[in-house]
From Swiss-Prot:
The keyword Manganese does not apply. Coiled coil: none annotated. Its EC number is 4.6.1.-. Belongs to the arthropod phospholipase D family. Class II subfamily. Disulfide bonds join 45-51, 47-190. Expressed by the venom gland. This is Dermonecrotic toxin LsaSicTox-alphaIB1ai. It catalyses: an N-(acyl)-sphingosylphosphocholine = an N-(acyl)-sphingosyl-1,3-cyclic phosphate + choline; an N-(acyl)-sphingosylphosphoethanolamine = an N-(acyl)-sphingosyl-1,3-cyclic phosphate + ethanolamine; a 1-acyl-sn-glycero-3-phosphocholine = a 1-acyl-sn-glycero-2,3-cyclic phosphate + choline; a 1-acyl-sn-glycero-3-phosphoethanolamine = a 1-acyl-sn-glycero-2,3-cyclic phosphate + ethanolamine.
Amino acid sequence: WIMGHMVNAIAQIDEFVNLGANSIETDVSFDKNANPEYTYHGIPCDCGRTCTKWEYFNTFLGGLRKATTPGDSKYHEKLVLVVFDLKTGSLYDNQAYDAGTKLAKSLLQNYWNKGNNGGRAYIVLSIPNLDHYKLITGFKETLTKEEHPELMDKVGYDFSGNDDIGDVAKAYKKAGVTGHVWQSDGITNCLLRGLDRVRKAVANRDSSNGYINKVYYWTVDKRASTRDALDAGVDGIMTNYPDVIADVLSESAYTAKFRIATYDDNPWETFKN
């Protein structure tokens, strides 16, 4: 999965997919009542990027729905996965459940079109704080209450705080999550980060009793760091330059082992090294 980083304006969906992304990451900020409000990152952000592009969250979902609904004039067949980077740091811990509830209602209405031929992409809810695991509970219970529990088949999870892998496993246990787990590891492109924790995550994925289905590394903009991440066995790379990742994947060293995921590739299924 080539994951376009910080895609917060509708116009950027086309831009990143046209550069080779089959997945995008979008920032979601919340108001003080835990409503998802904007797709917005803000300053500071990655080096070389404009930090302030934004849409209202529900407006963005409408654009995303069009980009992932077959038959729509804006449809991109290859855009198959969306990571919502949920900026829950502005919320109190006791608002996490509400945030999950409100997020589910927004997606149901504006992305899934109440289950009637809505967008088809798989969704990863990426949460920065292990203490906010109840966001997952709120999300799940709301879709059940709204009579669309089947949409949970399209939803996966990530805790993005680079926490100890054992602590992440405990948070999933509390949230009752037993699959659909992506594990991120990374840092802004302005700084360097080694691959030690990525290797631990890959080892968990490849073990017989691990909780991780997929591992992705962020934010990778250079060919050398792309090769290092692929050599470590990651499933996804988040980048500001999808064309760079696509170029490296077409090198002879990688064409035998990796290919770009399509809609038919289940993002919750584990492939071991």
